[in-house]
Amino acid sequence: MTNEADKFVVDVIYALPTQQKVISVSVLPGTSAIDIVRQSNMVSFFPEIELETVKLGVFSNVVKHDQVILPGQRVEIYRPLIADPKDVRRRRADKAKDEGRANKVTGGRVS
């Protein structure tokens, strides 16, 4: 049986390009990542967070919603990517070729 003395503090973190929010939540052992996010009420500050589909992590490692969080860990809420990384890299490479900073055939650096 767990009691109030067994509780520990977990930080829930969400960051935007211009701001970040950290909310500390006191939880019982065995609490899942998504339950901690719900308890933090981060959605009231950032309504764009969709709890059913949001990706969560612990110290930069993606975890499942039902992952049990341990003392000393923090829960990170990840935003979806705005652009496909492959497309961004391809556009950057094409721009370098057009500007003469990359070989038009191989894509490597110009000597």
Curated annotation (Swiss-Prot):
A Pfam family (short name) is Ub-RnfH
Residue span of region Disordered? 88-111
**Listed InterPro entries:** Mopterin_synth/thiamin_S_b, RnfH, RnfH_sf
Q: What HAMAP family would the database entry show?
A: UPF0125_RnfH (MF_00460)
Name under which the protein is recorded: UPF0125 protein SO_1475
Q: Give the protein family.
A: Belongs to the UPF0125 (RnfH) family.
